[in-house]
């Protein structure tokens, strides 16, 4: 898990016109992903013409059964994988135009990551884990310290900074991971099953924290199997067989009403029903 973290830091809107929506911070246009076996004898299409956009300040959950393509989609948005065809834009910048040597810097400067298993480095203190993206970006200590204080205060982990990951709870680890994600002031936070390793109480606290961060203007995309987690989002995008199956917008719905809408859609999806995106 630590190696995965270091790799990332080191190394109903359907839209096809990248310049047509000035509010969109992220645009995914006709993205396909085909995996080929080692000797090229078999091909698996993980994504098929996926198109959607995310506006600045949106909180979008992505759901789908295992193997539906949602993790592949997240990896492409994270610039960890490349589409076979199609384009992804972040604030108008096309991913395919970014040179390989610049990808790690692009991730550090524009994306924040929150993982299911926290991906904290055990031999680093909580403070050092949070500051690591800034260290890798070459920031001066006084600037790092200036950014750290308001972030840890907001997340309620100021007293944990000198501790190590093995000395704190799962919920506290995930708060530290969120702090690490937002300390760079990213344009987009990508969360992969962020409540998956947490108990019910810690999950509720994390979801409340995500809502608070989103209310401050942070754009979030969260992949999740949890109906409860997804019901906190402003929009839920469902992936089935590598395609956008359906989207639900919160509107004036409460979390309870969103929960029911999501559950109903998942029931249709599980039965193999058809639904327009």
Predicted regions and their residues:
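Short coil-to-helix segment of the ABC ATPase nucleotide-binding domain corresponding to the Q-loop/switch region
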Residues: 124-132
């Amino acid at each position: 898990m630590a190696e995965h973290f270091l790799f990332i830091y080191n190394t109903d809107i359907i839209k096809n016109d990248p310049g047509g929506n000035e509010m969109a911070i992220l645009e995914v246009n006709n993205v396909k992903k085909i995996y080929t076996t080692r000797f090229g004898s078999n091909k698996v299409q993980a994504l098929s013409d996926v198109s959607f956009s995310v506006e600045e300040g949106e909180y979008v959950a992505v759901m789908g059964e295992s193997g539906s393509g949602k993790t592949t989609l997240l990896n492409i948005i994270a610039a960890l994988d490349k589409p076979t065809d199609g384009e992804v834009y972040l604030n108008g910048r096309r991913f395919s135009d970014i040179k390989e040597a610049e990808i790690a810097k692009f991730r550090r400067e524009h994306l924040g990551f929150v993982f299911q298993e926290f991906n904290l480095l055990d031999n680093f203190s909580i403070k050092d884990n949070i500051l690591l993206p800034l260290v890798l970006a070459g920031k001066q200590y006084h600037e790092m310290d200036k950014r750290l204080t308001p972030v840890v205060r907001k997340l309620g982990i100021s007293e944990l900074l000198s501790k190590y990951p093995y000395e704190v709870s799962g919920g506290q680890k995930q708060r530290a991971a969120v702090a690490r994600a937002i300390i760079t002031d990213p344009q987009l936070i990508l969360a992969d099953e962020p409540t998956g390793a947490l108990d019910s109480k810690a999950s509720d606290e994390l979801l409340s924290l995500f809502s608070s961060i989103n209310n401050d203007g942070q754009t979030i995309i969260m992949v999740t199997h949890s109906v409860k987690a997804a019901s906190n989002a402003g929009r839920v995008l469902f992936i089935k067989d590598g395609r956008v199956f359906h989207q639900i917008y919160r509107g004036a719905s409460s979390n309870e009403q969103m929960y029911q809408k999501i559950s109903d859609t998942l029931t249709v999806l599980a039965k193999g029903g058809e639904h327009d995106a």
